Amino acid sequence: MQYNQDGDTYIIYVEQNEPIMETLTQFCKDHNIMNAQVSGIGAIKDIELGAYDLDNQEYIKELYSDIWELTSYQGNVLLKDDEPFIHAHINISDHSLSGRGGHLFEAKVAAVGEFILRKINTDGKREFDPNIGLACMALN
C-alpha cells in the first residue's frame, strides 16, 4: 500500500493481491482516522459481496473469484466497538460489461486499487439496532 496526504485527504494505492477492506481498515487505525468517507476504482478479484435480508436479519452472500472492474466503491468509516469500521458498497463489471453490486465484505486487488479517503472531524459511531439487526449510524 502506498499513500499521499493533503490535509484531511489521502490518496491510497492498494497494491496487487492486497485485501482492500483489511488494508483500508488498518490504514485508518494507523492514522487515527475514526470518521471518513472513502471512494475508489480499480480491478479486483476474490470478491465477497452481499445483500441484506431485513426480514431474516442476515446477509445473502455471493463469491466472485474472477477479475472484475471495480467501477465504484463508496464507503464510510465510523467507530464500532471503539475501532474504525468501514461500511462499503461496490459496483463491479465483468468482461462482457455485465454488472453486480452490493455490500462489500472483502476483495483482493487484481491489478490496481485506487482510493480517496477524506477524514471527517466528527464523532459518529455505530451502535447495534435490534430492529435492523445491524450496527447502524449513531450521530448523537
Predicted feature locations:
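N-terminal intrinsically disordered, cationic/polar leader segments
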Residues: 1-87, 91-140
